């Protein structure tokens, strides 16, 4: 027996059962004073919130005659509410002590409570719902049947009642019996008959006969009130079947007691003989309460226990304070009609928990007489022969089963055997695979942790350099170098180990491929059989599940490490910011602050406020170079297992990149330098314009650089952009056809069939290729073409950059003024453009001479600079000259 069981056996176990309300209580609608909180806690007379008559005002002592609620909490070993069944009570009370009873310990179960609280129903029950006594007998004989091959068990039962302080035998018609105390047997009832039933049916019949002889009379409280205390006792004697000179015999006694309920004559209306019965019942229960109080009071040593004050307490002497394991079932009523009885029952039950007893198994060692030796020897010889026969039968049965198994293996389907063999191989492979994978993920986590710690150490050292003195910086530098060297050494060791684990994983993958190819030989058309395919799929799913759980654990560890660093950083910031603000205002008040310091303080304020800053794509970020810490997405990402494809047996080692992590780059626009910053050289122009996307064949692209001022005249090669719907209305139909035919380099020869301007375009392109042969070929014949200067698309001189159609900033008024200023400074570069050798158009900017009404015509002329046919006449639907406008 374990130590826990011994501790429980030394203390009385107390349970409480709350019965449902009867018809009378429901009719009168008495309030409930007992509330079951859970399986162990019970609340008696709890406080209830009452709605006050006055709105928003609580009245105190409104009814001075009203009784205050006790609001008591009781804790017991088990609490059963109104919905509990007889089987539940038996499972938690008597059934656990049956094992102790079979081991030779005395056990007692008794029901205690007021009249009408449900004690008799709990112990005896009815035909539809049998009680604890009936269920105990069934389970006891069931246990005896299980051990009958090892031990000889004999049972004896007795049934008595204590009526008006007299003991009567319920199984026979006898007079009052006397109580004696024996030094060896303990308390003994002289003249009590013992019956030896052979089965559970016989013992239940005896129990039924005894209940019929029990004294019961109706009262005003209970129609079937028990007027006596009933004690049902079972004696069990166990002896080993093995013949021996020294026999060990176990003798135990179990007592199942149904006590009569305490009552008050004013409530029960008892008169005459009923009044005498009630007086004796209360006397015996009072003596029982005094015994419980004396046993529960462990502070006083050598205290007198008043067992002799009643016949009932004398019978329960062994059960309460002797060598016995006792369980008390306290039955209570939830109604306020039995308020005092319920309170007294709970009070005595709570005290009974403190009663302790010393348990001892009743094992007797019987030495046989010398005259019995011959008989014992014969019994042992017979037992030896019986055991030999059993052993022989067992060996024959085992040999027969082995032959049957061999026959099954011989006659079984070869495919089934192969399937079982492959299943075992898959189990072994995936067990190794799971271990290797777990080791790999662990190494990956340790490497990430080392990288994170290294970055934290470097960051901490930078902060120390900015804050501390030189002596402390030197010490911190030595400490940092030592830690970084240690982390580096550890990381190198982990990397080597990681490579070894990766090789092991590759070997396991090769073996898995070989097994899959062998499994394909079993199936039809080179497919794996369905059973093996399901088995393989289950193994993969199980491996993925284990891997995800491991990754979650590793992510939690890394997150904890990062959270610790964040807390330290937050503590530093919380300490520095108030000091910085205080120093700033001190300098401000004394006038020692300058503009640079104010600007720095404003920048810090912006950082603290977390304001968002809009920046162009080509502008450099000051904090971009300070990203020493690894990203959270990269930190929390572990290498995933890719689906394994089956390969032939002769294939070499599988892809070693299975375990490698594929970096996920953040999508961003390709930054192109601003064309205004390009130097006027052929090489630089070609290097910046090689293999750009074709703007004719694709949609409009957003601007990829920040427009900037141009202070010097530079030779520009504006990119060909797809004209929008607004510019298409200004361009003529011939120029649109020419632009559409430039979409593919292979179709440039077809341009000769169209307008004359297209031949000029092709010639200019060929001239450009001959002039710069080092230009790289086109990336794609359909998706992109080289962006060439706009001068090759016209026979006139090229326009300056300010005269071109702006791509983004042209829609703002400020940009228009900017380009007008640039046009005056770029006219000087027009003459230098004529020396390039290409046919160009030149339109002079006369915006300063002409009136503002002609700006509309001038803009239309600017957008038609991409015309390729110089002989075509410009046609306008409306003449916008000065005379027509007026």
Curated annotation (Swiss-Prot):
The modification Phosphoserine is found at residues 674, 695, 826. GO terms for biological process: cellular response to estradiol stimulus; male meiotic nuclear division; microtubule depolymerization; microtubule-based movement; mitotic metaphase chromosome alignment; protein transport; regulation of microtubule cytoskeleton organization; seminiferous tubule development. There is a cross-link at residues 24, 683, 782, 862 (Glycyl lysine isopeptide (Lys-Gly) (interchain with G-Cter in SUMO2)). Its main location: other. Keywords: ATP-binding, Cell projection, Coiled coil, Cytoplasm, Cytoskeleton, Glycoprotein, Isopeptide bond, Microtubule, Motor protein, Nucleotide-binding, Nucleus, Phosphoprotein, Protein transport, Transport, Ubl conjugation. It is found in: Cell projection, Ruffle; Cytoplasm; Nucleus; Cytoplasm, Cytoskeleton, Microtubule organizing center, Centrosome. Residues 774-804, 862-886 are annotated as: Disordered. ATP binds at residues 113-120. The keyword Cell division does not apply. Residues 11-355 form the Kinesin motor domain. GO terms for cellular component: caveola; centrosome; cytoplasm; kinetochore; kinetochore microtubule; mitotic spindle midzone; nucleus; ruffle. PANTHER family: CENTROMERE PROTEIN E, KINESIN-LIKE PROTEIN. Microtubule-depolymerizing kinesin which plays a role in chromosome congression by reducing the amplitude of preanaphase oscillations and slowing poleward movement during anaphase, thus suppressing chromosome movements. May stabilize the CENPE-BUB1B complex at the kinetochores during early mitosis and maintains CENPE levels at kinetochores during chromosome congression. Interacts with CENPE and ESR1. Belongs to the TRAFAC class myosin-kinesin ATPase superfamily. Kinesin family. This is Kinesin-like protein KIF18A. The lineage of its organism: Eukaryota, Metazoa, Chordata, Craniata, Vertebrata.
